[in-house]
Each structure stands twice: as C-alpha cells, then as structure tokens.
Amino acid sequence: MGLLLKIVQIAKNIIPVPPIGYGGTERDIHYLTNCLIDRGHEVIVFAKQGSKCKGKLIPYPKNSSKNLLPFVKKNLPDGVDVIIDHAGFVAMAKLPIPTLCSIHSAYTMNVQFPVYVSKFLLEQQGNGKGYFVHNGIGVEDYPYIEKKENFLLSLGRIIPSKGTHFAIKAAKGTGDSLIIAGNVPKKGIAYFNKEVKPHIDGEQIKYIGEVGGEEKMELLSKAKCVLFPITWGEPFGLVPIEAMACGTPVIAFRKGGVLETMNGFPELTCNNLNVMVTILQRNHFPSPNRLRQYVIQHFSAEVMTNNFEKLIHKAIKEYKK
C-alpha cells in the first residue's frame, strides 16, 4: 500500500462535491477522495456548502467565492503531507506544503507542480512543462445496457464550442431522432435561439434541458450513440468516457482531449459533419462490453488515483530536496 498520507483537496466554491448536474472537476474530486480513502489515506476536502464526501469536509463560508486563501490557511489541519488544489489559489500562494495543482482548463497559472487533465492541455497550456493525469470515473456508478434504443444523444452545455448544431445536422442527415440535454448558459442564449431552437419539433429533435442523476444515466445507457462534435480543443471532455462506461458508442470530432479519450476507437472520430453522418449510416460500432472495458482499463477512478499517487510521492520527494 505504501506510505499513508494526510491529504487535502481544494475545490472551488461554486459547485458542490459531488455535483448534481454539470461539474466535471467536482466529480473528479469526489472519485479521487473516495479512492484515496479506500487505500487508507486521510483526506480533507475544502468545498462549497452542501457538499458531501467520504472524508472530512470543511465547507467554505456561505456566499463567498473570492479570497478564500485566508479561510483555508486558518482551517488547514496540522500535519498535512500534501495538497491537491483544483482551484489554483492555494497552489499559487506557494504554502510550505507540497502542492499539486490540478489544472482542468486552458488557464495559465504560475505553480510549482502543475498536473493537467490531458497531454493535450499539458502541451498547449503548459508548453510540456509539468505532468498530466486523465480524469477518471467510478465505472460501477454507470449502468451498463447492451440493448440500445433508437435515438441519438447530445449531452452538455449548449454553447457554440460544443457543436450542438452539428449534432442536429447529423440527425437530420440520417433521419435519426435526437435528444438534446443540457443547460443554456448566458453566453449560449443567442446561439440556442438561432442554431438550436428553430429545429426543435418535439418529435425528431427534442430538447429536455439539463439532466443529472438517474435521468442522465438512463439517457447515456439507452442511447444508440452519443454525438460529441466539439469545435474547439476541449481539455478533456468527460461525456465520451461516461457514455462508453455505459456501453454506448460515441462519435466525436478530433479536437483537443478527444484524441486521448477516444484513442482506442479512432474509427469513431472524424473531422467534419459528412464523415460523422457516414459513420452513423454505417452503423457498425464496437460491442458495448468492449467500450466499457476500455474505460475500466484507461479512465476509471482507480487508474486516475494510481497516477495521482505516483505524482503525490514525486511532489513530496522533490519538496524535501
């Protein structure tokens, strides 16, 4: 098992851990905390009020999102061996404790031990300096269904970079029905009204809003295929992993972290709408079991924790030099 440690995880004060709907980073913190505790480590989590975790939870003050550093310093337990900061403000403060900064987005931070969520982000944002650990999920939480229903699924925030309009065009190109599930943030309202809403007919193209919990799992596990036609270099992209954990195939545009998450199934990636339609029409996908096993082997919470543990020990060793 190795040396047992006292580990602090730092979340942002925006979304609770674990999240109800949107919140990939918070889901990572949830799974990483559980796995570290299962391995005998002591884990303390600073997170938004309303969060729930297997370890000790230290909730941030209510309605406070700025300058949380004094609160963390004041409430930091004695004897902490290492900090994993998913928010950035603790790592940038350079406290006298080994600190890994888990970087989930294309945001530049001056930290000593950066850990990016993908090799793509490490190279693009970190210029190759630092490390990367892929996100992982608790595959056992995702229902596995072999017999799929006859609908396509577009899951995620409805903004131009997620390519919801391409999912609509792909469905119209094949005649398949499409369910669009996701929230429309402020920056996506104009896009939704122009590119998405006019196509919603309640029959072939349905929009059901943001989903979470059992409803999200049911959609992911029953969909014939999940479409992920992103138009930007997304750092990681959790939806393909979640879908494949349910045994559901994904067709994705070759952008950003998709080249890593879909590395085992290059035949399901493409560069444009026409090829996406062709793949759908071909209707030849890997077996549901093969998709799920791929996630277990490469993107499970256990694999993520293995990789974090290696970097934790490396960070502690380097700090002591």
What are these regions (language model features)?
Residues 105-143:
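Donor nucleotide-sugar binding/catalytic pocket of nucleotide-sugar-dependent glycosyltransferases
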Residues 128-181:
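Conserved donor-binding/catalytic core segment of Leloir-type glycosyltransferases
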Residues 193-211:
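Nucleotide-activated donor-binding/catalytic signature segment of Leloir-type glycosyltransferases, i.e.
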Residues 217, 240-245, 259-260:
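Short alpha-helical segment that forms part of, or immediately flanks, the ligand-binding pocket
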Residues 224, 246-247:
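A short alpha->beta transition loop at the rim of the catalytic pocket in nucleotide-sugar-dependent
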Residues 249-252:
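Short hydrophobic beta-strand element within catalytic cores of glycosyltransferases
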Residues 263-274, 280-285:
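Conserved acidic donor-binding segment of nucleotide-sugar-dependent glycosyltransferases
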Residues 285-301, 307-310, 314:
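A short, well-ordered alpha-helix in the C-terminal region of glycosyltransferases
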